[in-house]
Amino acid sequence: MTSKVRKAVIPAAGLGTRFLPATKALAKEMLPIVDKPTIQFIVEEALKSGIEDILVVTGKSKRSIEDHFDSNFELEYNLKEKGKTDLLKLVDKTTDMRLHFIRQTHPRGLGDAVLQAKAFVGNEPFVVMLGDDLMDITDEKAVPLTKQLMDDYERTHASTIAVMPVPHDEVSAYGVIAPQGEGKDGLYSVETFVEKPAPEDAPSDLAIIGRYLLTPEIFEILEKQAPGAGNEIQLTDAIDTLNKTQRVFAREFKGARYDVGDKFGFMKTSIDYALKHPQVKDDLKNYLIQLGKELTEKE
């Protein structure tokens, strides 16, 4: 097994029911944060981290993802002819990425989506990046979380899962770790991984947040994994099994995480990102200040 992490897997086969009717014909991952689809943030994080090849696991009604990262000759020609070089650079940026696509024919859970990447990954360590979690998108100087996991792997040669503290009453929405003692420099040894525990049963408030660096042995486990929570093949359950034969670490993320998996999180992310966007930040800031005054006066 090579020691270098070169490949990333982005599961994008979910139905996106929380955003209906917008996602009836449009992939949820293509919903824009101001002017950039959420999946492009994920791909850019991977490339910034040094990932060389990316596999996107898609499903039905996800063709728009492939189209976004494909060339569009008519659009590119039009922008070039009109001298819109800045826009042309933005379009070119989406087509210069080494992306591959495979379809998950039946939505049987995250674990099954990752299993579709077995042939692509081969006998190499790899990263799984979930599209609902955007990391540090308003801080260009931050070290990407994926890069942090890759750096950990260079030292430990072990699977490493990203975690961060969440409110105790929200742990049932996440996979949660039971750490072995105190972490060292934000890196924890893990006793067990538990998928979506009830708050009273949660071993900690350290929740898995959508970035995983895994060794290829995970595939053999996923092939035998019985359905878990929600009657789906749960990646967290497979990682817990892996942890019984290989050490699995948890890296505590201390940056800014944005959850775009629900409407409020998506709106909050859009506002925070827009307040850093050079084309709209000033107007938006003034609007929010005025809106705040109006709302205060109505109370």
Curated annotation (Swiss-Prot):
Catalyzed reaction equations: alpha-D-glucose 1-phosphate + UTP + H(+) = UDP-alpha-D-glucose + diphosphate
Record InterPro entries: GalU_uridylyltTrfase_bac/arc (IPR005771), NTP_transferase_dom (IPR005835), Nucleotide-diphossugar_trans (IPR029044)
Enzyme Commission number: 2.7.7.9
GO molecular function: UTP:glucose-1-phosphate uridylyltransferase activity
Pathway(s) it belongs to: Carbohydrate metabolism; nucleotide-sugar metabolism; Capsule biogenesis; capsule polysaccharide biosynthesis
Presence of keyword Nucleotidyltransferase: yes
Keywords attached to this entry: Capsule biogenesis/degradation, Exopolysaccharide synthesis, Nucleotidyltransferase, Transferase
Annotated Pfam families: NTP_transferase
Record bears the keyword Cell cycle: no
GO biological process, one term: capsule polysaccharide biosynthetic process
Superkingdom: Bacteria
NCBIfam families: galU (TIGR01099)
Homology family: Belongs to the UDPGP type 2 family.
Name of the protein in its database record: UTP--glucose-1-phosphate uridylyltransferase
Organism: Streptococcus pneumoniae serotype 4 (strain ATCC BAA-334 / TIGR4)
Gene (UniProt): cap4C
